[in-house]
Swiss-Prot record:
It is found in: Cellular thylakoid membrane. Pfam families: Rieske, TM_PetC. It comes from Trichormus variabilis (strain ATCC 29413 / PCC 7937). Binds 1 [2Fe-2S] cluster per subunit. Its cofactor is [2Fe-2S] cluster. The 4 large subunits of the cytochrome b6-f complex are cytochrome b6, subunit IV (17 kDa polypeptide, PetD), cytochrome f and the Rieske protein, while the 4 small subunits are PetG, PetL, PetM and PetN. The complex functions as a dimer. GO terms for molecular function: 2 iron, 2 sulfur cluster binding; electron transporter, transferring electrons within cytochrome b6/f complex of photosystem II activity; metal ion binding; monooxygenase activity; oxidoreductase activity, acting on paired donors, with incorporation or reduction of molecular oxygen; plastoquinol--plastocyanin reductase activity. Keywords: 2Fe-2S, Disulfide bond, Electron transport, Iron, Iron-sulfur, Membrane, Metal-binding, Thylakoid, Translocase, Transmembrane, Transmembrane helix, Transport. One of its GO terms (biological process) is photosynthesis. This is Cytochrome b6-f complex iron-sulfur subunit 1. Component of the cytochrome b6-f complex, which mediates electron transfer between photosystem II (PSII) and photosystem I (PSI), cyclic electron flow around PSI, and state transitions. The lineage of its organism: Bacteria, Bacillati, Cyanobacteriota, Cyanophyceae, Nostocales.
Amino acid sequence: MAQFSESVDVPDMGRRQFMNLLTFGTVTGVALGALYPVVNYFIPPATGGAGGGTTAKDELGNDVSVSKFLESHNVGDRTLVQGLKGDPTYIVVESKEAITDYGINAVCTHLGCVVPWNAAENKFKCPCHGSQYDATGKVVRGPAPKSLALSHAKTENDKIVLTPWTETDFRTGEEPWWS
């Protein structure tokens, strides 16, 4: 009868197997690292707090004080602040004591240029391709296909708070395209 040995020799990992394992690990790590930004691109960014809104910021990133804002601006002035999602937003002075209850997003709906207010002509005029919007941001001349987006503007603790506009657009009577 043949006698079997109790200890079975298990061969050590050879150099070739080790190099294959090391190469596989390196390639997998690089591929996952390259794939991360691609996957991240398709995940939408988180929105702000639950209906809390965004405090308007000036050009230096400081909160806009309503009392100081009204002291330094005339009735009918439209002034840019940093609004929702960091977009430039016009705040309109309604009277010496109040701002309008809406802000006008300054990003042109044609190609995304910032649209300046032309006080002499009482309208917004895009410098890129000539689109024009009335005093409320409604498109009056193309090539821009849509009116400027709106946001709610309200005063809380002497600060301007902007919240998303989800109701019917008062300028067109239609559902807002931006929500």
